[in-house]
Amino acid sequence: GSNRMPVHPDLIDLAKNGDTDAVKLMMKWGYEGSKKFIGGNPVEKIIQSPRDIREILAVDLIACNNYTNGSNAARLIDCPSLLIFGSLDKMVNLESGKKFSSLIKNSTTHIIEGCGHMIMIEKAFEMRDKVLEFLK
């Protein structure tokens, strides 16, 4: 589940039009804003064409922007849950993440320092270790 994740209308418009700037802007905000990728941007390797941007990224951004039931859904979660946030995330700021975590019964929150929104790309080993620790 997720809480409300508003997306700037200009970013949605770029994605709907298949503009490659949509991917670049999303990654600038999502990946700690300044790091360079070894071997190139992984999202640009997945979303390669204007059609991909329209059919994958735009649909995802619109879904994030329009979803409004996160708080209600979170209150219904009734199993141990781990929420991992990046301290530098500009897409889901830390305060919003903590508020969302507080809605889930029996939840554990872990903050990965020096990490943005793309936790699995930025800090894969730390994330993996925290998930394994939680599952034990």
Stretch-by-stretch model annotation:
Residues D10, L25, E44-K45, V59-A63, ...:
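Alpha-helical elements of Rossmann-like donor-binding domains used by nucleotide-donor carbohydrate transfer enzymes
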Residues L14-L76:
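Conserved alpha/beta-hydrolase catalytic His-Asp/Glu region
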Residues A15, D89-V92, G116-I119:
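Glycosyltransferase donor-binding loop in the core domain
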Residues D52, V92-E95, E122:
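Residue-level signal for the nucleotide or nucleotide-sugar donor/cofactor binding architecture
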Residues I77, L83-F85, D89:
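Short beta-strand/loop motif that positions the catalytic acidic residue
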Residues C79, N93-S102:
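Short alpha-helix in the alpha/beta-hydrolase fold that links the catalytic acid
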Residues S107-K136:
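Catalytic active-site module of serine/aspartate enzymes centered on a nucleophile-bearing elbow/loop
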